Amino acid sequence: EKRNVGMVFQSYALFPNMTVAENIGYGLRIRRAPVAALRARVSEMLAMMRIEPLADRRIEQLSGGQRQRVALARALAVRPRAILLDEPLTALDAKLRDTLRLEIDGLLRSLGITAIYVTHDQAEAMALGDRIVVMDRGRVAQVGTPREIYHRPANRFVAEFIGSLNRLTGAVQGGVFVCAAGTLPWQTGGPAVREILFRPERTHLIPPEGASLRGTVAAAFFLGDRTRLFVDVGEGQPVIVENGQRREFVHGEAVGLQVEPGDVFVL
């Protein structure tokens, strides 16, 4: 209260003995806001969250998404300098999470309120964050924009924690990286490099004939908008490929792999 910081808890922490309107106005009431100002602010928040019809309902009568909106309205009603959101979407189903994530982003940006958003969902952090702080066992591993964190991870932990990661082991010989799967033009690091890293979505399938990197399909999972392939390249860990083609893949099918040198990094 003294720091003027709002908070949205993972469990929402709404008061079951109060109506929706009373919950939203609670922070203003304990600050002894004038009654007229309190009512006006509650009406404003109800409209902003599009929950006016719920004003007189009890908390047990609300769905998970409605409770989340009430909790956010309560935190914003006091016009905080900053707001802390502690995994506010964890308890919701995937489709509702996507909808509310978009609403929260638009609302906080329109109000110009600084938000600290705690989440274990990497996609959520990438979608909402202007700056991301990656924590490793209580210590800051990296601070940066979503693009910096994803494309230029500071260390192995960050690279593996944010998104999926492919790796190939081998050695640099004559300007190319040589591994069990074949060769890759090399321009990233020095001759001492023994492992290269790259993202699944930057790994492309090409015909195996003439491909410098080759493997066989170990597994293929159709996910609707794409197929996730696990390609055996002669190493312990398969290479993951996110492929948008509509064709089906069969176990043991030979495929070629293409990775642009600029999409490869070393740590």
Region roles according to the model:
Residues 3-6, 10-157:
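ABC ATPase nucleotide-binding domains
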Residues 165-167, 176-267:
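Non-catalytic connector elements of ABC transporters
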Residues 102, 156, 170, 215-218:
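Small-residue-enriched segments and motifs
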Residues 161:
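Nucleotide-binding/hydrolysis machinery
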Residues 1, 18, 261-263:
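Short, flexible active-site-adjacent loop segments at beta-strand->alpha-helix junctions, enriched
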Residues 2, 73, 106, 122, ...:
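Short, flexible, glycine/charge-rich loop motifs used to bind or transfer phosphoryl groups or to couple energy/partner
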